[in-house]
Every structure is written in C-alpha cells, then in structure tokens.
Design a protein with these regions (language model features):
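Active-site beta-strand-loop-beta-strand hairpin of nuclease catalytic cores
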Residues: 86, 93-103
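Interdomain/boundary linker segments immediately adjacent to catalytic/signaling cores
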Residues: 1-74, 80
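Charged, often glycine-rich, active-site loop that binds/positions anionic groups
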Residues: 75-91
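Catalytic cores of nucleic-acid endonucleases
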Residues: 108-156
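Glycine-rich, flexible loop segments associated with nucleotide phosphate handling
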Residues: 45-47, 86-87, 144-149
C-alpha cells in the first residue's frame, strides 16, 4: 500500500484532534479533582497528548512493511544507551533484528510561555540527538545502518 497525501493528512488531523481531546479531558479531570494547579499545567501533566502522533507513525511504519514486532512504543521497552547519560527513553523505536532503524520523540508546546519552554524543548532535542549520535559513533549500536532520528513538535 502506498501512503497518499490524503492518508497522511487524515493521520495528521486525527493526531491533532487526539491531542486536543486528551488535553481537554485532562483539564476537566484536574478541575473536578478539586486540586489547584498553575495555569494550564493540569491539562498537560497527565501525559498521552502526543499518542495520536505516535500511533500515526506506527501505521506509517506498518504500511512501509516494517513488521509489527519491530515497532516499540510506550507500551514496550524504549530505552536506548546514550554517551553523555546512561540511557534515554524514546516515544517510538524501530528495531529490526537487533539493529536500531529509527528513534522518534514527540513533544508539544502550547500556551503563553512560548519563549522559555520552546527554548527548553530545542535544547532537549539537540541534546538527545547529540547523545544518540555520539553513542552511535562510539559503537554503542550495531553499525550496519545509520538510524533515522526524528522529533515531531506540535506548536500552538
């Protein structure tokens, strides 16, 4: 099966819809709990907002012929060795026959404190990439193929 522009648009639209639905549900849950939280924090501390994007990547990997057992998500082991830190947990890994093919991280940035939070996200992405590439260079991974490293950011 080939990924069409319409299919990609639908996957992206569903992922964005999932993001906002989860965020709203978490905000409602926080309000109903009676516990006070700062600003929009209650809508984001529950996690899972970006799962729609991870599910979209899983579907794309399956369409591309990647076996289901080679795709690891939050429900499965996701830690990779680093160089500057012992390990890093990713949102999605593709590991086929012991070879890392891809690592993907999904992050979002919503709300009024765009500058500082966005800067933190960029530093995190750059640091994680440098850590993985240095570990790869220093032979922490099988070197049969250079893995694909991806970050997806959802910005409001």
């Amino acid at each position: 099966m080939e990924v069409t522009e319409q299919m990609a648009a639908t996957l992206a639209q569903n992922a964005v819809t999932h993001f906002w639905q989860v965020r709203e549900a978490q905000a409602v849950k926080q309000r109903n709990s009676g516990k006070a939280d700062q600003g929009f924090r209650g809508a984001v501390t529950g996690g899972a907002q970006m799962n729609g994007f991870i599910e979209a990547f899983v579907k794309l990997a399956n369409i591309a012929g990647v076996p289901e057992e080679a795709v690891y998500t939050k429900s499965r082991f996701l830690e990779l060795p680093g160089y500057f830190r012992p390990t890093k947990e990713w949102d999605l890994l593709i590991v086929l026959e012991g070879v890392l093919l891809a690592a993907i991280e999904a992050k979002s940035q919503v709300g009024p404190s765009f500058g500082n939070n966005f800067n933190n996200r960029i530093e995190e992405a750059m640091g994680s990439a440098l850590d993985l590439w240095t570990a790869f260079r220093e032979k922490a991974y099988k070197r049969t193929v250079r893995p694909w490293l991806g970050y997806i950011f959802l910005l409001e």
